[in-house]
Amino acid sequence: DEAHNLLRLIDDIMQLSKLDELTHDMMEKFTLQDVAQSALARLKDKAGRLQVSLQLVDSTGGDSKLLGISSLMEEIFFNLLDNGLKYNHPGGEVTLRLSEGENKYTVSVADTGMGIPGSELPHIFERFYRVDRSRHKAIEGTGLGLSIVKHGVGFHGGSIRVVSTVGQGTEFIMKFPKPKYEAEK
């Protein structure tokens, strides 16, 4: 309903304004697993209502420490997972994958949803941008979630890219540097 949409817009704008105020002295140690579990728990009921499978695949060994702001990282995961649910279909899947290399962690969120046309991909991280609204009028959103994701990934020293095929789904792939104390193990 309209009141819910307005509340979501205000919340997203507040999130964006907070990003400008983040400083590195706010950083803390946290694990990607804890953040992933929190984001998944917040969306469990929605996934059930939409009849979309929501899963975590962790090939890291289970203790992937990162230095950053855990609440911001959770919001990154939440926004990507939520989009994967919203732009999917009953019987579809959304998978959050955690893996690691020598000096970095890779986090991906992949869905089996409707996909994003290639012509739209250069714009998806812009504030208030929504992919071809004529296709998605019934899907709620403010067009700010992916902008929050991009800024949050950048704050953590990471990178993000997207691979998508219309009718097959989308995958967002993020890479985050391991903290020096982790990379040297």
Stretch-by-stretch model annotation:
Residues 116-128:
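Short conserved segment of the HATPase_c
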